[in-house]
Amino acid sequence: ETGVETAFVETVPEGTADFGNYVRDFIEQGFNVIIGTSFGYMDDMEALAEEFPDVVFDHISGYKANGTNFGNSFGRMYEPRYLSGMVAGSATSSNLIGYVAAFPIPEVIRGINAFTLGVLETNPDAQVEVVWTSTWFDPVVEGDSAQALLDKGADVIAMHQDSTAAGEKAEAAGARSVAYNSDMSAHA
């Protein structure tokens, strides 16, 4: 036992008062460290950190910080991205790899850069083309973006999205895919 008391709540929608209400509840219960694990909580956490200067706020995957009680952290997801890029570079026949990506934020860009470096490590002739969807979860937009890349000749589709749509489009076209954030084992 560590002597540290923890509590959590799941499935809190982004962009609603719910997140702030849960945080205030935790603070009233005496919690002095708050960790938010969704990119969409970033602005709310920034405001809450200002409101509660004696509470430490850590935002997973964000890029904002105030230097006192609000910071961010994220795992080294670029490392497996690099490795998956090596596999994609070895797997492509067309030398065009498509990448369906949500938003041009540091987390996503780090992943794309690492993936591309991995591709080039095993196939210096390959190119990675990125399509931005401007959404974390919209299966129609993600699928259409993957299809556009497939139509250009991509035979491997990678993604940084929250649905399986891009991978499903790749599978339907007989292409390979590199998943992220969604269980794609049914399509392997």
Please name every model-derived segment.
Residues 1-188:
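A residue-level marker of the well-folded mature domains of exported/periplasmic proteins
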